Amino acid sequence: MKLMCVLIVSVLVLTACQLSTADDTRDKQKDRLVRLFRKKRDSSDSGLLPRTCVMFGSMCDKEEHSICCYECDYKKGICV
């Protein structure tokens, strides 16, 4: 009986610890994955060229695959 109580209490404590740390790291984990992907993409041995974005007001086009820093208005053909 004592062993069962100790087991239940320990499971509850571990669950509470996981829930409290999960809230703190929710956004940080996403940023870590983004940084890891960018680091891999921009490394010299990846075989990929680093992407540069086109600034606001510059021309963008679907066919040329221009990459705007924010968003491309394809109707007007400019980065917004």
Curated annotation (Swiss-Prot):
Keyword Disulfide bond recorded: yes
A single GO cellular-component term on record: extracellular region
Disulfide bonds: 53-69, 60-72, 68-79
Keyword flag Zinc-finger: no
Keywords, sorted A to Z: Disulfide bond, Ion channel impairing toxin, Knottin, Neurotoxin, Secreted, Signal, Toxin
Signal peptide start and end residues: 1-22
Pfam hit, one: Conotoxin
Tissue: Expressed by the venom duct.
Lineage top rank: taxon: Eukaryota
InterPro entries per UniProt: Conotoxin
Gene Ontology molecular function: any one: toxin activity
Locations listed in the record: Secreted
Propeptide positions: 23-51
Family (UniProt): Belongs to the conotoxin O1 superfamily.
Record remark: domains: The presence of a 'disulfide through disulfide knot' structurally defines this protein as a knottin. The cysteine framework is VI/VII (C-C-CC-C-C).
Protein's UniProt name: Conotoxin Bu3
Species: Conus bullatus
